[in-house]
Amino acid sequence: MMLSVFKKKSCSYDVTIFQTPRFGEKKGYRAVYRTELNGSDHQDVLKRAFSLFNVFDTVPSDYDARFMATGDVILIDEGRKGKTYYQLLPAGWRKINRLIVQTT
């Protein structure tokens, strides 16, 4: 089992989802849900978040926001390691500057 030696260990990440009140808006992002997700790295967590919040049967019962869509933002907060924001674009997730997310 040499392959398992190189596999990155999964850990828990603090994840916050930001959405605008209406799909397609570019301002007014609000935090709509916060949770912890396990993953081996940021890309793994983003993949898991997209899957979790876009399949009706897997959405948590206390999640009141819409399904994730283009333009939505995810914050991954690693405490002392810092915060990283990602925006969902048609081509996938892109790291963004936190100044783009202006909460109201």
Curated annotation (Swiss-Prot):
Domain of life where this protein originates: Bacteria
Pfam families per record: YodL
Protein name, entry field: Uncharacterized protein YodL
Lineage: Bacteria, Bacillati, Bacillota, Bacilli, Bacillales
Gene assigned in the entry: yodL
